[in-house]
Amino acid sequence: MDYDDEAPELTLRLESFKDCWAEGAELVRAEVKEVEPNGRQFNPDVQSILTNEALGIFKILVARKNGEMIGYLTWMIDFDLEAYGTLIANQTAWYLKPGHYGVADKMFDFAMAHFKQVGVKYVYWHHTFNGRGKTLGRYFQRKGAKPISMNYMIQP
């Protein structure tokens, strides 16, 4: 499933991580800098990502304008261990270069259509408390999501 906007310069596609990583690493660095005030370092586990992608678990949706990568949305598809036979998706990373208004909404809609197509029953979206994504909770609610939990991070 691909999305080509009425304006042909915007494309949304599921891409292979290995095919977009060299270009995407710059965006991931920008995302980490924007949303990680706790000192979490940029050091992706590329081999685990590739393994999960080969298993059909990890997916990356890439937004491009005139061929240039401007954003990505990633998720992991899995089974709900507490509800037999229930396929779920957990959003992992989502980043869009500043100034590309409306593209994030198109990315969300693309992902939701994909989830429906592959039989996902529940999607777990999240947002950080830092950076531009800190207001995504209201956006998710406008799209029909309900807040169900809050995550906490601690170093042992």
Description of each model-found segment:
Residues M1-N43:
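Short amphipathic alpha-helix that is part of the acyltransferase structural core
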Residues P37-I60, K65, L73-Y84:
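A conserved beta-strand-loop-helix scaffold within acyl/acetyltransferase catalytic domains
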Residues V123-T135:
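Conserved beta-strand-loop-alpha-helix junction that forms the acyl-donor binding cleft
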Residues K106-Y122:
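Conserved acyl-CoA
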Residues G67-Y72, A89:
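Glycine-rich phosphate/pyrophosphate-binding loop shared by adenosine-nucleotide-utilizing enzymes
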Residues H126-H127, K146-P156:
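Conserved catalytic-core motifs of GNAT/GCN5-like acyltransferases
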Residues F79-Q91, K146-I148:
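A conserved beta-turn-beta hairpin within the catalytic core of GNAT-like acetyltransferases
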Residues N90-G102:
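A short, internal acetyl-CoA/4′-phosphopantetheine-binding micro-motif in the GNAT/acyltransferase core
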